[in-house]
From Swiss-Prot:
Source organism per UniProt: Kitasatospora aureofaciens
Function: Participates in various redox reactions through the reversible oxidation of its active center dithiol to a disulfide and catalyzes dithiol-disulfide exchange reactions.
Keyword Transport listed: yes
Protein name: Thioredoxin
Disulfides per UniProt: C31-C34
InterPro entries per the UniProt record, alphabetical: Thioredoxin, Thioredoxin-like_sf, Thioredoxin_CS, Thioredoxin_domain
Length: 106
């Protein structure tokens, strides 16, 4: 139930070709709110194990992924299902809101 670090090189296999829905969290090392959300994402990854995969993208290291999916501010979460973006959520959010977002998009 751990979160997966995804890069430009692994995005296709880890996210687009995943047999499960993938929640992709776009973050950056300089982003305060991203650091606050990180432990919540780890909890979500454990609680939703088997139902959803949780992946993190460092936008500083993978700017092309951010621009490809129109991520302009971080943190942003995109829910991928079958290689397509099914839903998105911008900004820091408490665990209850993240869980509600997941439940609605699964």
């Amino acid at each position: 139930g751990a979160t997966v670090k995804v890069t430009n090189a692994t995005f296709k296999s880890d996210v687009l070709e995943s047999d499960k829905p993938v929640l992709v969290h776009f973050e950056g090392p300089w982003c305060g709110p991203c650091k606050m959300v990180a432990p919540v994402l780890d909890e979500i990854a454990n609680e939703y194990e088997g139902k959803v995969k949780v992946a993190k993208v460092n936008t500083d290291e993978n700017p092309q992924l951010a621009s490809q999916y129109g991520v302009r501010s971080i943190p942003t979460r995109l829910m991928f299902k079958g290689g397509e973006v099914a839903a998105n959520m911008v900004g820091a959010a408490p665990k209850t809101r993240l869980a509600a977002f997941l439940d609605a998009s699964l």
